[in-house]
Amino acid sequence: VTRPASIADGYAADDIRAAEAPLLAAGAQLMRVAAAGLARVCRAEAPEGAVLVLVGTGNNGGDALLAAAELAREGRAVRVIRTASRIHEDGAAEAADAGVRVTASDDLDDDAVAALGRASALVVDGILGIGTTASPALRGEARRVVAALLPVVAADHGPRVVACDIPSGVGCDDGAVPDPTVLPADVTVTFGAGKAGLLRGPGRALAGRVALVDVGLDLSGATPLVLADA
């Protein structure tokens, strides 16, 4: 008996992007739906306390910035560390309007990054997403920030970690981890459909629990790389 495909299965990043394209062309607010789902999981993982959001370039960072804005509007103390010179403009503007302080990572030394982590109940990893086409390994400022936070999240009573779509540093399709400088997530909030890299390879252990936010993708023409219950 052929098992029907499920959006919880692990799909290739190219198939996800292809399924997103017609919705984006039609003006669908995929990022807002994704951000609302991310914020919902953040509340569940850390109902109170400060939130530290790590933001890189691209739409992954945009999702994280919009979620940061939503949490800040609810009265949460939210701080953003920007690891890239350019971040999602609309997301950054909305976060700033909500009172979120955005700091460039190169304005913070390792001790300052670690101190922000220790002061937080939750760290959100929004550095890299499925748009990464080269090696998933973190580099430069992103790698330095994550390295500074690793002992913080590993400590007793350290902050919870929520990854946005896929933990930064994990290969989207193969789950490869070419550099161990990866924040291990307690929960990965993935959008549209499961990513194969969350279900296989070293990435599986780093993803934690996978929470799927359905944004209405049509994946009927795509074949999963990994079955969720395999």
Name each region found by the language model.
Residues 1-17, 23, 120-230:
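YjeF_N-associated NAD(P)HX repair module
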